[in-house]
Amino acid sequence: TLPEDEFIFPFSMPAGLPPEEQIKVAQLDNQEDVAYREHLVQSYGKYKQMISGIHYNFQIDPKFIDALFHAQNETQSAVDFQNNFYLKIAKNFLRYQWILLYLFSATPTVEDKYFRGNSPLKPHQYVRSLRSGKYGYVNDPKIHVSYDSLQEYVETLEHWVKSGDLIAEKEFYSSVRLRGAKKARDLLKKGIQYLEFRLFDLNPFAPYGMELADAKFIHYFILLMAWLDDTADQEGIKLGKARLAEVAWEDPRQQSVY
């Protein structure tokens, strides 16, 4: 519980930032977790550690997936069928995620101190989502992880960890991550169990950061990604990411160009 004179800050982007040296790295019992956060400070700076957002976990009822599996005769393995089902959702989400950003973004500005160097924002300029754009909590643009198959997802993610560009798999900050095991490689045996969506800014008007109506809309949007006839390929995913970056930087008071 909070003292009566303290409140939870309702925005994703921080405000009232103190000098960086006054921000302490979280002290945890597990020293690996402490080392991980110290790495993030070195890579991204302390101010970016102050960003927050909603992680939306989504799982299809296993009984429903099993029923779909037995209603088809193309895929021999139940695990492969489940993986392909979740991969289709993930790929189509990356293709069309900009629509949700347009509807639910809520990080139009931040104080100048947040930026290393001069602010890229012009006076009185507002954008849809600083958090989801290149000035938010994102990986280096060269970090590319393939969603073509679960095998390629695992191998490309492990590549970036081995190269040192990521200190751990959890440093991969995609809008959607494949979940269900502590290590990505374990998914090859267990299969994808659920998806983690990381796109969403906090809704500053919602007590818990997201309204129930918004959560339900996102739920139906994710289901739509499964029911679309087509599955986005790498070019489609690339287009979706480019469009996300454009929409994130648009004036939130105007309609999107799309």
Segments predicted by a language model, with ranges:
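A short acidic (Asp/Glu
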Residues: P19-V25, L68, A206-M210
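Extracytoplasmic glycan-interaction modules
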Residues: T1, M13-A15, K63, E74, ...
